[in-house]
Amino acid sequence: MPIRVPDELPAVNFLREENVFVMTTSRASGQEIRPLKVLILNLMPKKIETENQFLRLLSNSPLQVDIQLLRIDSRESRNTPAEHLNNFYCNFEDIQEQNFDGLIVTGAPLGLVEFNDVAYWPQIKQVLEWSKDHVTSTLFVCWAVQAALNILYGIPKQTRTDKLSGVYEHHILHPHALLTRGFDDSFLAPHSRYADFPAALIRDYTDLEILAETEEGDAYLFASKDKRIAFVTGHPEYDAQTLAQEYFRDVEAGLNPDVPYNYFPHNDPQNTPRASWRSHGNLLFTNWLNYYVYQITPYDLRHMNPTLD
């Protein structure tokens, strides 16, 4: 699915170097196709890096996806140039009257911060409430899963004593579920979080269906039966080097982090890591776009039929 982005977005050249099909707005305007409209609420500090990661995964299918980047934190960013934010991001007020086929809410490094202490917590709640009537399907990633479970289901914040960091094995519970279609029975995916997601908590306090778990019994992938909301507690979008960058950052900060599990060859941080989850990440996002977005969204977004209560 060629992603449709502004001509000047840095991700265009970055992804084309990887032979990823990116369609600029100027080229897409010549095609008489109704693209899928996908809104990305990017909560990560290094926004350009996160854009590249998600856009790479959204590009792997034959239909157009029109990407809109959203920000809700008006504070000055220390990691992303203001010019980039001003040129490529919209504010909530710019899109609140629009409808979208899909919404992705990224993770954020807020695992040890109480919800009410998050500077933009009211805006997070506003976007999630808005999405019930304006978005066909929403995908929450890592910290956003924890936030959504609290807002939508009233589940208190669950925090691990130690950070979960590394590449872990998972197994699917429903091999014929649409979101896991084509998955191997067991697959690898990276995690980097303090948030805790015991599968029993999801089963006992929500009506969500768990589709994949970690070997330790944590919920990894779960969704509502009507496909309106889906949750992934790991980071299938991560590059091969992302966990390494986080590890060495924490080492330099004197935090004495554990070496990410099952990541560096021979468990030696001096060795170059390789991505062992790339096919899983691509298939997950392709399935979400196809089965949770494309196949249930109306052709005319003005005729949305929200079912999420």
UniProtKB/Swiss-Prot annotation:
The keyword Acyltransferase applies. This is Homoserine O-succinyltransferase. GO terms for cellular component: cytoplasm. Its main location: cytoplasm. Keywords: Acyltransferase, Amino-acid biosynthesis, Cytoplasm, Methionine biosynthesis, Transferase. InterPro entries: Class_I_gatase-like, HST_MetA, MetA_family. The record marks S192 as: Important for substrate specificity. The gene is metAS. SUPFAM superfamilies: Class I glutamine amidotransferase-like (SSF52317).
